[in-house]
Amino acid sequence: MEKLTLSPISRIDGEINLPGSKSLSNRALLLAALAKGTTQVTNLLDSDDIRYMLNALKALGVNYQLSDDKTVCVVEGIGGAFQWQNGLSLFLGNAGTAMRPLAAALCLKGDTESEVILTGEPRMKERPIKHLVDALRQTGANIQYLENEGYPPLAIRNQGIFGGKVQIDGSISSQFLTALLMAAPLGEGDMEIEILGELVSKPYIDITLAMMKDFGINVEHYNYQRFLIKGKQYYISPQTYLVEGDASSASYFLAAAAIKGKVKVTGIGRNSIQGDRLFADVLAQMGAKVTWGEDFIQVEKSELKGIDMDMNHIPDAAMTIAITALFAQGETVIRNIYNWRVKETDRLTAIATELRKLGAEVEEGEDFIRIQPLALDKFKHAEIATYNDHRIAMCFSLIALSDTSVTILDPACTAKTFPTYFSEFEKISKNQ
């Protein structure tokens, strides 16, 4: 297995131009494909998850032109439901941002009835999709499980979704609601969605609603508990769509600065539609100096103190706080993060396990993690298992800000969202 050893870094300094956001990139491609008109999507992320979406769209008959550097895609919209030859199978890797929205969109009524199979890597077959399938079936969708009940692979027939009242569980993942919301306007009737339980990761729903609006569709909602969507509508291309920089990816550079230097990230700012921009506010609460601009966030180090906080609204960026906690004064508790357990891997167990290898004192609860700080000279060298999870690899790069080196196993797993992460991290790492 490939491994990468990072030597201790004495300070962090520089500017990072962020790659496009994964969740915005795949939403933009799908909306552009379903829309009337041609859309030029710019600052598209070039990564594995985006390639799975692009390959699926091509197989579904969508024409697009991708620039040589893969960051600009001109998509010719089909102006409605997908059409395909019966018996199509789409392999989506471990891309939740492709699997969930496509599962809903492929239920829309086609001109001729066809079946499609959605499948992926072994880990994808362990990632729950039951809440979405249950909701789609309430609207009349025809979906079957091919292996284990509640998990991909799925067989879907394009017999239509017919609106009406739908209940969906919001407690595990906001991607299920996102998928339903994006498909609903093209359905055969008006839909009223009621959320069961507490909706997790609300800011990701804000992203979905903002993007649907950019493509001409308005959704009414009542305090994130009920959503009303008119059926028989069309998405209209905005002609161009700029994908914001990835706020989750910004978290590693901003945290590095809070621990040991100063960094400016460009591509997101105070008006970003991504909830993970709020990560910078968490760093500020821990004591870091944060400056906001229209299209940048700058963080400068200061003495950090531990925090006790509900981070349900920023689950991806919260992982970075788990590492930052080692460098703070006093314990840190990250709460209400059960959905870490259904991501690329069970992130709660994975992070607790790898932190302990470094010598950290960690308590792992069902939906929280409690972390005690470590003195810079008390970190143990460790080989960090990454569980084929891009965010674990990027998080643990920050351990090099201690007095000891760290070895990251399978560093190439960052290709899911940020193939050039380690070279960008190296650019801001100073050793004099």
Curated annotation (Swiss-Prot):
Keywords: Amino-acid biosynthesis, Aromatic amino acid biosynthesis, Cytoplasm, Transferase. GO terms for cellular component: cytoplasm. GO terms for biological process: amino acid biosynthetic process; aromatic amino acid family biosynthetic process; chorismate biosynthetic process. 3-phosphoshikimate binds at residues 22-23, 27, 173-175, 201, 316, 339, 343. The active site is at residue 316. The keyword Cytoplasm applies. The keyword Ubl conjugation does not apply. GO terms for molecular function: 3-phosphoshikimate 1-carboxyvinyltransferase activity. Phosphoenolpyruvate binds at residues 22, 96, 127, 175, 347, 391, 416. SUPFAM superfamilies: EPT/RTPC-like (SSF55205). Pfam families: EPSP_synthase. CDD domains: EPSP_synthase (cd01556). InterPro entries: Enolpyruvate_Tfrase_dom, Enolpyruvate_Tfrase_sf, EPSP_synthase, EPSP_synthase_CS, RNA3'P_cycl/enolpyr_Trfase_a/b. It catalyses: 3-phosphoshikimate + phosphoenolpyruvate = 5-O-(1-carboxyvinyl)-3-phosphoshikimate + phosphate. It is found in: Cytoplasm. Its main location: cytoplasm. It is an enzyme of class 2 (transferase). Pathway: Metabolic intermediate biosynthesis; chorismate biosynthesis; chorismate from D-erythrose 4-phosphate and phosphoenolpyruvate: step 6/7. Its EC number is 2.5.1.19. NCBIfam families: aroA (TIGR01356). Belongs to the EPSP synthase family. Catalyzes the transfer of the enolpyruvyl moiety of phosphoenolpyruvate (PEP) to the 5-hydroxyl of shikimate-3-phosphate (S3P) to produce enolpyruvyl shikimate-3-phosphate and inorganic phosphate. Monomer. This is 3-phosphoshikimate 1-carboxyvinyltransferase.
